[in-house]
């Protein structure tokens, strides 16, 4: 599953009407930011918390930032 994560995709709410706070990796700032997820579909740049977002995107794509969790 984690091999298919694309950290370069923009956040995608999806067609459902939920309001779930999730995290996505923002490539330009190399940080994880929150967005409102509808609850279904969307894309793989979608994480339940900042820890997993940084784990799968910042370290994998850019190496450890050296500043701790952002």
Curated annotation (Swiss-Prot):
Keywords from the UniProt entry: Disulfide bond, Protease inhibitor, Secreted, Serine protease inhibitor
Domain BPTI/Kunitz inhibitor: 7-57
Entry keyword Secreted: yes
Localization of this protein: Secreted
Tissue expression remark: Expressed by the venom gland.
GO biological process: envenomation resulting in negative regulation of voltage-gated potassium channel activity in another organism
Claim: Secreted is one of the keywords in the record: yes
PANTHER family: BPTI_KUNITZ INHIBITOR DOMAIN-CONTAINING PROTEIN, KUNITZ-TYPE PROTEASE INHIBITOR-RELATED
UniProt family annotation: Belongs to the venom Kunitz-type family. Scorpion delta-Ktx subfamily. Delta-Ktx 1 sub-subfamily.
Function: Serine protease inhibitor that inhibits 85% of the activity of trypsin at a molar ratio of 4:1 (Ki=760 nM).
UniProt-recorded name of the protein: Kunitz-type serine protease inhibitor BmKTT-3
Organism: Olivierus martensii
Lineage: Eukaryota, Metazoa, Ecdysozoa, Arthropoda, Chelicerata
